[in-house]
């Protein structure tokens, strides 16, 4: 199953990256936009994308404004928030009734503290696929975990136990403005050709190699709130684990990158 789902995603990625003649590509783009109800009001028009992958990975025409105050945490992406809560004995939910162990997702040996609040951001095929820093961060490590590429939509989350932990994923181990640990996890999914990270081009995802790899940074890589960290090549999921932060009532709400979603407490 692992080989099949990953092979299918590689094939889809190759097809999506193919540049058809312009009149054909325009029709493909228009069909995709119609099926998934893609809103291009902040983006270039459909005819400007030379491949389906170019449409998936489209960039904003203008920078979105966001609160620059250092104590404000912003949404890192355009997404639906499917679950959010404090960890309960190291347990988080991929969806209601489907728990998993947080330390396994991020690659720690010991359970995570109950002071961590987690937020699941589901990026659908219609969404802007880039992900950004939710606050000023120092990136200490990037951990790549090989795995399956199962869908991360709600039916699949209800059906497959430990889906996030079993799927291919990349966990950024970072330090926030207060010096607390913050985990930023990008979870792969079916038909997500690759996950890309702008701060380290060595990170390879959806490759044929089946191993875990750690990239350490000394000194740490410093990024500012709102910086573009990378992108999916179709919809998928971001999971944030944050400490000492008061979040708004977010569950089942759609958010946009740059929207204020929480506030850091003083340590």
Curated annotation (Swiss-Prot):
Pathway: Phospholipid metabolism; phosphatidylethanolamine biosynthesis; phosphatidylethanolamine from CDP-diacylglycerol: step 2/2
Domain of life of the native organism: Bacteria
Keywords assigned by UniProt, alphabetized: Cell membrane, Decarboxylase, Lipid biosynthesis, Lipid metabolism, Lyase, Membrane, Phospholipid biosynthesis, Phospholipid metabolism, Pyruvate, Zymogen
InterPro entries with a match to the protein in the record: PS_Dcarbxylase, PSD-B, PSD_type1_pro
Cofactor(s) the protein needs: pyruvate
Site (Cleavage (non-hydrolytic)): 235-236
Gene Ontology molecular function terms on file: phosphatidylserine decarboxylase activity
Keyword Cell inner membrane: no
Catalytic activity as recorded in UniProt: a 1,2-diacyl-sn-glycero-3-phospho-L-serine + H(+) = a 1,2-diacyl-sn-glycero-3-phosphoethanolamine + CO2
PTM note: Is synthesized initially as an inactive proenzyme. Formation of the active enzyme involves a self-maturation process in which the active site pyruvoyl group is generated from an internal serine residue via an autocatalytic post-translational modification. Two non-identical subunits are generated from the proenzyme in this reaction, and the pyruvate is formed at the N-terminus of the alpha chain, which is derived from the carboxyl end of the proenzyme.
Assigned GO CC terms: plasma membrane
Chain positions with Pyruvic acid (Ser) modification: 236
Its membrane topology: Peripheral membrane protein
Cofactor comment: Binds 1 pyruvoyl group covalently per subunit.
Active-site residue list: 78, 132, 236
Subcellular location as annotated: Cell membrane
EC number: 4.1.1.65
NCBIfam families from the UniProt entry: PRK03934.1, PS_decarb
Family statement drawn from the similarity comment of this UniProt entry: Belongs to the phosphatidylserine decarboxylase family. PSD-B subfamily. Prokaryotic type I sub-subfamily.
Role this protein plays: Catalyzes the formation of phosphatidylethanolamine (PtdEtn) from phosphatidylserine (PtdSer).
Protein name, per record: Phosphatidylserine decarboxylase proenzyme
Organism of origin: Helicobacter pylori (strain P12)
């Amino acid at each position: 199953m692992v080989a099949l789902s990953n092979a299918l995603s590689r094939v889809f990625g190759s097809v999506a990256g193919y540049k058809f003649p312009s009149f054909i590509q325009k029709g493909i783009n228009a069909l995709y936009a119609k099926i998934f109800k893609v809103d291009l009001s902040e983006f270039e028009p459909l005819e400007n994308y030379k491949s389906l992958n170019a449409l998936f990975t489209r960039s904003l025409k203008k920078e979105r404004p966001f609160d620059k105050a250092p104590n404000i945490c912003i949404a890192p992406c355009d997404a639906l928030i499917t679950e959010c809560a404090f960890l309960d004995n190291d347990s988080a939910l991929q969806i209601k009734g489907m728990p998993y162990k947080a330390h396994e997702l991020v690659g720690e040996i010991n359970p995570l503290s109950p002071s961590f609040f987690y937020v699941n951001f589901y990026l659908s095929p219609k969404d802007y696929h880039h992900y950004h820093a939710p606050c000023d961060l120092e990136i200490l490590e990037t951990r790549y975990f090989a795995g399956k590429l199962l869908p991360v939509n709600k039916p699949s989350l209800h059906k497959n136990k430990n889906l996030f932990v079993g799927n291919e994923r990349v966990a950024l181990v970072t330090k926030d403005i207060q010096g607390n640990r913050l985990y930023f996890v990008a979870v792969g999914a079916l038909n997500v050709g690759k996950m890309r990270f702008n701060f380290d081009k060595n990170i390879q995802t959806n490759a044929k190699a089946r191993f875990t790899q750690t990239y350490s940074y000394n000194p740490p890589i410093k990024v500012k709130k709102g910086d573009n960290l990378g992108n999916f090549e179709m919809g998928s999921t971001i999971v944030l684990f944050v400490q000492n932060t008061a979040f708004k009532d977010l569950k089942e709400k759609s958010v946009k990158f740059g929207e204020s979603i929480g506030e850091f407490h003083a340590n």
